[in-house]
Protein backbone atom coordinates (compact mmCIF):
# COMPACT_ATOMS: atom_id res chain seq x y z
CA UNK A 1 0.00 0.00 0.00
CA UNK A 2 1.14 3.54 -0.73
CA UNK A 3 -0.14 6.50 1.27
CA UNK A 4 0.42 10.21 1.44
CA UNK A 5 -1.10 13.32 2.96
CA UNK A 6 -1.24 16.53 0.94
CA UNK A 7 -1.50 19.95 2.54
CA UNK A 8 -2.38 23.03 0.56
CA UNK A 9 -1.77 26.49 1.96
CA UNK A 10 -2.63 28.80 -0.97
CA UNK A 11 -3.85 28.50 -4.57
CA UNK A 12 -1.69 26.24 -6.75
CA UNK A 13 0.63 25.21 -3.91
CA UNK A 14 0.88 22.02 -1.86
CA UNK A 15 3.25 19.85 0.16
CA UNK A 16 3.24 16.09 0.49
CA UNK A 17 3.84 14.11 3.63
CA UNK A 18 4.68 10.52 2.86
CA UNK A 19 7.89 8.61 2.40
CA UNK A 20 11.16 10.54 2.57
CA UNK A 21 11.46 14.28 2.13
CA UNK A 22 8.30 16.35 1.57
CA UNK A 23 7.57 17.25 -2.05
CA UNK A 24 6.53 20.83 -2.81
CA UNK A 25 4.21 21.22 -5.79
CA UNK A 26 3.04 24.21 -7.76
CA UNK A 27 0.43 24.87 -10.41
CA UNK A 28 2.90 26.03 -13.04
CA UNK A 29 6.23 24.57 -14.15
CA UNK A 30 7.97 27.94 -13.99
CA UNK A 31 7.42 27.83 -10.20
CA UNK A 32 8.66 24.24 -9.73
CA UNK A 33 7.36 20.70 -9.97
CA UNK A 34 3.67 20.24 -10.77
CA UNK A 35 1.40 17.22 -10.32
CA UNK A 36 1.85 16.37 -14.03
CA UNK A 37 5.62 16.68 -13.85
CA UNK A 38 5.55 14.21 -10.95
CA UNK A 39 3.62 11.75 -13.13
CA UNK A 40 6.30 12.20 -15.79
CA UNK A 41 9.03 11.71 -13.16
CA UNK A 42 7.28 8.62 -11.79
CA UNK A 43 7.01 7.02 -15.24
CA UNK A 44 10.63 7.75 -16.23
CA UNK A 45 11.87 6.54 -12.84
CA UNK A 46 9.87 3.33 -13.10
CA UNK A 47 11.23 2.67 -16.60
CA UNK A 48 14.78 3.34 -15.34
CA UNK A 49 14.35 0.91 -12.45
CA UNK A 50 12.86 -1.74 -14.74
CA UNK A 51 15.89 -1.39 -17.03
CA UNK A 52 18.24 -1.74 -14.06
CA UNK A 53 16.33 -4.85 -13.01
CA UNK A 54 16.50 -6.30 -16.53
CA UNK A 55 20.27 -5.91 -16.80
CA UNK A 56 20.81 -7.21 -13.26
CA UNK A 57 18.69 -10.29 -13.98
CA UNK A 58 19.90 -11.14 -17.48
CA UNK A 59 23.47 -9.76 -17.54
CA UNK A 60 24.47 -9.64 -13.87
CA UNK A 61 24.98 -5.86 -13.90
CA UNK A 62 24.44 -4.55 -10.37
CA UNK A 63 25.47 -0.96 -11.17
CA UNK A 64 24.40 0.61 -14.39
CA UNK A 65 24.33 4.20 -15.62
CA UNK A 66 21.05 4.82 -17.43
CA UNK A 67 19.41 8.05 -18.55
CA UNK A 68 15.77 8.27 -19.58
CA UNK A 69 14.50 11.47 -21.16
CA UNK A 70 10.73 11.79 -20.87
CA UNK A 71 8.21 14.31 -22.13
CA UNK A 72 4.44 14.54 -21.98
CA UNK A 73 2.01 16.44 -24.15
CA UNK A 74 -1.74 15.92 -24.62
CA UNK A 75 -2.08 12.26 -23.69
CA UNK A 76 1.27 11.20 -25.17
CA UNK A 77 4.43 10.29 -23.25
CA UNK A 78 7.69 9.95 -25.19
CA UNK A 79 10.62 8.28 -23.44
CA UNK A 80 14.12 7.89 -24.88
CA UNK A 81 16.45 5.43 -23.16
CA UNK A 82 20.18 6.24 -23.17
CA UNK A 83 22.39 3.30 -22.22
CA UNK A 84 26.16 3.05 -21.75
CA UNK A 85 27.96 2.45 -25.05
CA UNK A 86 29.56 -0.82 -23.89
CA UNK A 87 26.24 -2.39 -22.94
CA UNK A 88 25.16 -5.36 -25.03
CA UNK A 89 21.53 -5.28 -26.18
CA UNK A 90 20.79 -8.76 -27.47
CA UNK A 91 17.09 -8.21 -28.12
CA UNK A 92 15.57 -4.73 -28.00
CA UNK A 93 12.02 -6.10 -28.23
CA UNK A 94 12.63 -8.35 -25.20
CA UNK A 95 14.04 -5.39 -23.25
CA UNK A 96 11.04 -3.18 -24.03
CA UNK A 97 8.59 -6.04 -23.35
CA UNK A 98 10.20 -6.47 -19.91
CA UNK A 99 9.64 -2.77 -19.17
CA UNK A 100 6.07 -3.03 -20.44
CA UNK A 101 5.39 -6.02 -18.20
CA UNK A 102 6.96 -4.71 -15.00
CA UNK A 103 6.50 -0.90 -15.03
CA UNK A 104 3.63 -0.53 -12.59
CA UNK A 105 3.34 3.22 -13.17
CA UNK A 106 2.70 2.66 -16.89
CA UNK A 107 0.02 0.10 -16.03
CA UNK A 108 -1.96 2.77 -14.15
CA UNK A 109 -2.66 4.80 -17.29
CA UNK A 110 -5.92 4.65 -19.24
CA UNK A 111 -5.79 2.75 -22.50
CA UNK A 112 -5.97 5.95 -24.56
CA UNK A 113 -2.76 7.34 -22.99
CA UNK A 114 0.10 6.69 -25.42
CA UNK A 115 3.50 5.74 -23.99
CA UNK A 116 6.27 5.51 -26.62
CA UNK A 117 9.47 4.04 -25.22
CA UNK A 118 12.51 3.63 -27.45
CA UNK A 119 16.28 3.34 -27.31
CA UNK A 120 18.23 6.42 -28.29
CA UNK A 121 20.59 5.89 -31.24
Question: Where in the sequence are the language-model features?
Answer:
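Extended beta-strand/beta-hairpin segments
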Residues: 1-41, 52-121
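Alpha-helical metal-binding/catalytic segments enriched in His/Glu/Asp
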Residues: 46-47
Amino acid sequence: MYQTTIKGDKPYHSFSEGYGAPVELFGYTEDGETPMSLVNIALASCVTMCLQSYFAKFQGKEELAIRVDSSYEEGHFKLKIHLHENLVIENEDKLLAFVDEFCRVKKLFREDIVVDISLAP
